[in-house]
A protein has these predicted regions:
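Phosphate- and other anionic-substrate recognition elements at nucleic-acid/protein interfaces
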Residues: 1-149
Length: 149
């Protein structure tokens, strides 16, 4: 099992995933609550966080605030944390560095199934934008682990 986090300045999305890619838990919550979750979940699960990368362009305060939260999440973890860059997620899920959030979501639906409806929930029922990205991060980690074996 794995805890995957898409960090933000005040809230972060997370997904807990089994080794078969099935979803145990997901959501988006305030970063302080994410820290509390990390303290309990990483007793059992490894953790992966999307890491910020510099592409030579100016960045704003939000990027630096997110970096601080990434550090706090790592500090709260009881196991080794893997950092994965967004470009690696794009390449793994879509085979293109130019992939957008929409193309990542489409590729995940193609691979695992549709979102579904309340009456007929699918693999991703209840997912929202940032949760999709946390799941893509977790899938990338699990795919890379399988390649190593």
């Amino acid at each position: 099992m794995l805890l995957a986090i898409d960090p933000g300045t005040t809230e972060s999305a997370y997904v807990v995933i089994r080794d078969d890619y099935s979803i145990i838990d997901y959501g988006k919550m305030l970063n302080g609550n994410v820290i509390e979750m990390i303290k309990t979940k990483t007793t059992f699960y490894p953790m992966v966080i999307e890491m910020i990368a510099s592409y030579g362009m100016p960045v704003g305060q939000e990027v630096f605030e997110t970096c601080v939260w990434i550090g706090r999440f790592i500090q709260a973890s009881r196991k080794e944390t893997q950092l994965i860059y967004r470009k690696d997620v794009k390449l793994n899920i879509c085979n293109s560095i130019k992939a957008t959030d929409a193309s990542i979501i489409k590729a995940l639906k193609d691979r695992f199934g549709d979102k579904g409806t309340k009456a007929n929930p699918g693999w991703f029922y209840g997912f929202s934008k940032d949760v999709w990205q946390a799941y893509a991060l977790g899938v990338t980690y699990l795919d890379k682990e399988r390649e190593r074996l």
